[in-house]
A protein has these predicted regions:
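Bacterial N-terminal signal peptides
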Residues: 16-26
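Sec-dependent signal peptide cleavage junction
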Residues: 25-38
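Residue-centric detector for conserved, function-critical "anchor" positions
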Residues: 380-397
Length: 491
């Protein structure tokens, strides 16, 4: 088990600063009691409990019911006659469906079970693989809470790694159709989720399985170097190229695959190319109009020479799904956070590009008046304040969130990132990241603790509350990131 570290690494300098603030403004001892360095001693333990509660859901109800991983076969419809239509393949699949415990087969057949080779079939599983891998690696997996032994959790994770990586196109070089996944707008994201877990557990994975992962990661990295043009919401002249659709979060989730590749293959001749493209992609993901042509240096390179457009508005907001969308502001922070997590685990300095403009985005979530984009919301903010201007922990946005009810785990991660990386340095003390962090933690705890007839233990959402197919495993992914940044690898 890895040594766990303090949940809120504020340091003596932070405490000294808070003491000065409290004294200068005549605050009482309550000010220090609520400071990040003096947060409730049980917060870290409660975070671990919440993560294990969600793993309880994912490795039991989700695994056995929603994903039917108890139904497994080593021959699936993707290996059937290529002349069959999708409908015919599904008919073959159903006719041969048998109940087999996952322990009794050498390899799970992920596409037999999910019937999808695209996002809905792969992404939720990739997040689960990521989360179980990190829980085992960082040592907070609690089999007493989850109800699945650590050995079984590891076996389940490894079988999923083998199954999903095994269906990547790189492991079927002679295939002439599109049965296998890869080289798509999200495939680098899925590959990094799977690859990170495999890399962390590499000493526990059979060489032939790890080789599948290596081929998958190398193939996706090759695509990003040689067959990928960085997209921009707005070009260098200010013309909107993709109306209503920033490309920032997509670039960020692809970039992290290159970060993984550089650590998995430190001696590769491609490492220089990976690092160069990684730098460009990270900066492009969060570039603002004023960054175009800028002489500002990031990791010793001029920003203006690395980008040819922007994906974030000048005030730190962004547009996605034709909305000024808080979910995607948070998602960019989360995806950039994945790259930071890799550097922290590898013990290397985090590049400046990985935090480029993240402070502007986080500040916008707290400080941008929504009346700028929706007159009916004048005087309101993405992070909601009460009538006295104090943080509440609730969130909103111009228009209605098209995904449904908010998932507070991602906002908690954003706050942890802002607190540990100093993204809130320009924000007034009453609305510092640690204040929101505490509030969003409580919202998240309330969310997972709710009881209802149709809600399984450890589930964040009630049926119908959120339409994102990966929402449960994605919430856990955010918490696993937060744990790395604040506890296991805070610096």
């Amino acid at each position: 088990m890895r040594e766990n570290r303090r949940m809120f690494p504020s340091g003596r300098s932070m405490l000294a600063m808070l003491l000065v603030i409290c004294l200068c403004f005549g605050a009482s001892a309550t000010c220090l009691a609520e400071a990040p360095g003096a947060a409730e001693p049980g917060r870290e333990a409660e975070l671990v409990r919440i993560m294990n509660l969600n793993l309880q859901y994912l490795l039991n109800d989700w695994w056995n019911s929603e994903k039917d991983y108890v139904y497994a076969t080593s021959t699936n419809f993707t290996k059937a006659d290529s002349s069959l239509t999708e409908e015919q393949r599904l008919a073959v699949q159903e006719s041969t469906r048998t109940f087999v415990n996952w322990r009794e087969v050498d390899e799970l057949s992920i596409f037999y079970l999910d019937r999808e080779r695209a996002e809905n079939g792969i992404r939720p599983v990739s997040h689960l693989i990521y989360c179980v891998g990190l829980a085992l690696y960082d040592g907070y997996y609690d089999e007493d809470i989850v109800g699945v032994s650590g050995a079984d959790a590891e076996a389940m994770c490894v079988k999923l790694i083998s199954a999903v990586a095994g269906e990547h196109r790189s492991n079927h070089p002679d295939a002439t159709d599109d049965r296998y996944w890869g080289d798509s707008w999200q495939s680098a994201l899925w590959a990094e989720n799977i690859g990170l877990s495999a890399w962390l557990l590499r000493d526990r994975i059979a060489p032939e399985i790890y080789a599948k992962v290596e081929r998958m990661v190398l193939d996706e990295a090759h695509t990003l170097i040689y067959d990928y043009e960085i997209p921009y919401y707005r070009d260098a002249d200010g013309t909107i190229v993709y109306p209503g659709d920033t490309k920032g979060e997509e670039i960020a989730w692809m970039a992290k695959l290159l970060a993984l590749a550089r650590f998995m293959f430190p001696d590769s001749e491609e490492r220089g190319a990976w690092d160069d493209q990684l730098e460009r992609m990270l900066v492009s993901a969060t570039a603002m109009p004023e960054d175009v042509g800028s002489d500002r240096l990031v990791d010793g390179r001029k920003v203006g020479e690395m980008i040819s457009g922007s994906n974030i508005n000048g005030d730190g907001t962004l547009v996605n799904h034709n909305l000024y969308h808080i979910d995607y502001m948070a998602t960019i922070l989360e995806e950039m956070g994945d790259t930071i997590v890799l550097y922290r685990i590898a013990g290397e300095p985090v590049p400046e590009a990985a935090v480029f403009n993240l402070d502007k985005i986080y500040q916008a979530m707290i400080e941008v008046d929504l009346g700028k984009y929706d007159e009916s919301r004048a005087g309101k903010y993405f992070y909601i304040r009460d009538e006295n201007g104090q943080p509440t922990g609730n969130v909103e946005m111009p228009g209605e969130d098209d995904w449904g009810k908010a998932g507070y785990a991602i906002y908690y991660l954003c706050d942890v990132m802002a607190d540990t990386l100093g993204l809130d340095r320009e924000i007034e003390v009453p609305r510092k990241a640690w204040v929101w962090e505490k509030l969003h933690f409580e919202k998240m705890r309330e969310q997972i603790s709710r009881q209802a007839e149709d809600k399984a233990p450890g589930q964040f959402f009630l049926p119908g509350e959120n339409s994102f197919v990966s929402v449960e495993s994605f919430m856990m992914h955010n918490l696993a990131e937060a744990y790395v940044l604040a506890v296991s690898h805070p610096e």
